């Protein structure tokens, strides 16, 4: 399973792969890349992927997560609700509070994400993300730049 990718001179090691996504880790940046490899991830598989990140944080220092959704073509509200209301809350306790997202270049997908967040905040609370920083970026390199700037300040 030794497959590595390099962004901005940082080597990311493949640490988990399933039929739906790949997880890569870089210890210097304390960052995990979660890359959706397919157009749709069923909710049970979606939960397994993110539960794997929860397990990884027990073994590795992870302060930054980038979820690259560019390959997704299906928006699934129940997955997003679980991700926001359950998973992000549990992972916040473990110190993973910096989340980066790359959305598909599809206007309807962006609108669905915004509408989905609105519904989640209405159902749970608008301060659901207190203590969690979410940044939307266009590239993995942009997220790395942001991490480097924040660690040098």
Predicted region positions:
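Amphipathic, Lys/Arg-enriched alpha-helical "gate/interface" segment within cytosolic domains
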Residues: 2-153
């Amino acid at each position: 399973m030794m497959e590595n990718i390099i962004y901005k001179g940082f080597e990311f090691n493949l640490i988990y792969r399933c039929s739906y996504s790949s997880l890569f880790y870089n210890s210097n940046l304390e960052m995990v890349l979660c890359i959706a490899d397919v157009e749709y991830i069923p909710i049970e598989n979606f939960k397994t992927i993110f539960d794997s990140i929860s397990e990884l944080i027990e073994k590795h220092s992870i302060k930054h997560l980038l979820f690259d959704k560019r390959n997704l073509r299906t928006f699934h509200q129940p997955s997003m609700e679980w991700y926001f209301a359950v998973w992000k809350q549990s992972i916040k306790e473990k110190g993973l509070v910096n989340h980066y997202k790359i959305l598909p270049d599809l206007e309807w997908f962006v609108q669905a994400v915004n509408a989905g967040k609105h519904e989640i905040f209405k159902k749970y609370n608008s301060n659901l993300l207190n203590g969690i920083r979410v940044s939307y970026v266009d590239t993995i390199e942009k997220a790395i730049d942001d991490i480097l700037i924040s660690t040098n300040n």
